[in-house]
Amino acid sequence: YQREPTKEEVIKTLRDTGVEILANSLPVGSEKATHFYVECALEAGCAFVNNIPVFIASDPEWAKKFENAGLPIIGDDIKAQAGATIIHRVLVDLFKKRGVKLDRTYQLNTGGNTDFLNMLNHHRLASKKESKTEAVQSVTAQRFAKENIHVGPSDYVPWQKDNKVCFMRIEGRLFGDVPMNLELRLSVEDSPNSAAVAIDAIRCAKLALDRGIGGVLHEPSSYYCKHPTYQFSDDKAY
């Protein structure tokens, strides 16, 4: 058993080691732990990059605290470089622009890393499902009815290890009410896929620190995260 550090000890470590940016990649559902480290970052004078779906940057109270402290924050819930959510968003946005009326969709994900193992606990999964679902809903021409959209982790397959597989289906109607559907299978290595975007988010936080910009960085949050304060299309955010 290893004793957990106190808040004062964490703050002292952050200050003594010269940490400028604290990136949060705790397990999904770690709400209390995330709040603990956010408070530590604020008191230690660190910028914060929130890679998980515990809502901090998109929470007005937390956002105000970072603004008052003059510290930048990016969040919430990082989008992978070429992951299921970004591809789902781009396709839904494309169909909207092409006038396709969408009826229903699903995104089912399996993986074998500890992230997927952790999400077998459905009590920890609620914020993740909300984040991923809203990322897709926000780019639709007309929001899907609740029963017509399912987006979220589906199961833990140990032998997949860090490989993540997504099965996606989108159903809609073309000109003349003619039905269409699209099915897609995506296979990626989960950790490096997310790390690519997390690194860019950290770079943006550092630029903001150097320029004395505090509060939520809305542009990188909208481009890099699934649950930002403001949801823009990826083209606009870019």
Label every model-predicted segment.
Residues Y1-A47, I56-F66, E183-Y238:
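Metallocofactor- and cofactor-centric catalytic cores in central/energy metabolism, strongly enriched
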Residues S30-K32, F36-A44, V49-R104, G111-H122:
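Glycine-/Pro-rich loop/turn segments that contact NAD(P) or position catalytic residues
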Residues I78, A82-G214, H218:
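Active-site-lining helix/loop region of Rossmann-like oxidoreductase modules
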